[in-house]
Amino acid sequence: VSRKWSINTAIDVLRETIREADEMGLSDVTICPEVLGKINQLGTLEEILEMCRIDERLIPTVDFGHLHARGMGCLNSPEDFEKVIEDIESSIGVERTRKLHVHFSRVEFTTGGEKKHWTIDDIQYGPEFEHLAGILIKKSMEPVIICESRDNMAEDAAKLRDIYINSGGKLYEESSHY
């Protein structure tokens, strides 16, 4: 099975899902396809953006740990994160990008991509949330951020929140999303 066939099939399924949601009166639902961490899986950032371009109600879930793993450790500076955000903005627009759905954790990877999620304190793995937090603030973004740390999600979510606030960010009411 080719990647092209897989992406076309995924797009067809998304279109059908949106049509069925509309028929059920759920036209206000947002669907967030996710960047996946293993090289052999459908779900590169470019593939997810291609899916999201078919309807305004599709917002990418950018798992920065997965992106870092797929790129063999590619997110090492604020500029690396800013480039990702700018690529998303040029693909789906600034306003949809401002409301991005984000997953974040440190990730161990191999040549096949993601191997294992780790905690924020496992500093031998990347990426660094501080780099992303600064870009989110600089671009006045209001993303939903989900912490996916291994065995420590609630505690690490609080650490991510504190990093964001200490970087100058402010928290937004949940009702302002989507």
PLM segments and residue spans:
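Short, electropositive alpha-helical surface patch
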Residues: 4-16, 46-56, 113-133, 155-172
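A short, acidic, flexible beta-alpha connecting loop/helix-capping segment that sits on the rim
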Residues: 145-155
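Active-site acidic/histidine proton-transfer and metal-coordination neighborhood
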Residues: 1-62
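Conserved, mostly hydrophobic/aromatic
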Residues: 31, 63, 102, 145
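Gly/Pro-rich active-site loop or hairpin
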Residues: 69-141
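Active-site-proximal loop/turn and secondary-structure-junction residues that shape catalytic pockets
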Residues: 1, 35-39, 64-68, 106-108, ...
